[in-house]
Amino acid sequence: MAFEDAALERALRAETKHGLTLCGGVSELTVIGCGWMAVIPEIELRDRLRGTLGALVEMLGYIPGMETVQIVRSKGAFVVNTVLPEVVGEEIAGYIVEEDEEEIRPTGLRLGLNFLMQKRNGEIVGVVPRGANLDVRRYAITPGGIVRQEDGDTGERLYRRGYRPREDTDSEATLRKWRHLEAMSWCDWDAPEE
C-alpha cells in the first residue's frame, strides 16, 4: 500500500497538529497519522529528495532510520520523542489485520469535514479523507471502520471512519436526520466500477 507522494506530503504537513508516529524498518518507513497509516518503500524515500522525504526532513531535520519516533508540534517547533516499537504495534496491526470488508461508495454529500459514504446495507458513515482522490470508485470498509481506497495509479490509502451519530451521545434530531439519509439510496450499485 502506498500514498501518492504529493498527497502524503500534504497529509504529513496537516497532521503535525495531532502528531505523527514514524516506524523505521529495513526496507520501508511506516507513517501513522490521526486515523491513517501509510507504508513508504525505502526506495521511494531515497529517490525522492522532495515530496515525502522533504516533508519528513523538514520536520525532523534528518532522514528517519531504524527507529520509532513520535513527532508533535509544540510552541511553533517540532518535538521528536523516541518510543518503543511495541507501543505502536497494536495500532499498526489494527490497520493491516482486519480482512472482513464491505463495499462502500461515496454519496456526494458532505457533513462538515466528513464525506458521507454508504454501504450496500444502507448504513451511512462520515469519512475524513486525508489527501484522498474522491473520483476513485473502489472502496471497502472494515468492521473497525478503516476505509480502504484502491486505485491502480496511486496504490491503496487507508483512513478511519470519521463520524457516525451514537444513540447514547447525539440528540434525537441528529439521529432522526441520519436515519432519513440512510433510508435513501445515494449510490447506483448496479453501475459498473470505473
Feature-to-residue mapping (PLM):
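The feature marks the first
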Residues: 1-40
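C-terminal functional regions that serve as terminal interaction/effector modules
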Residues: 26-27, 32-194
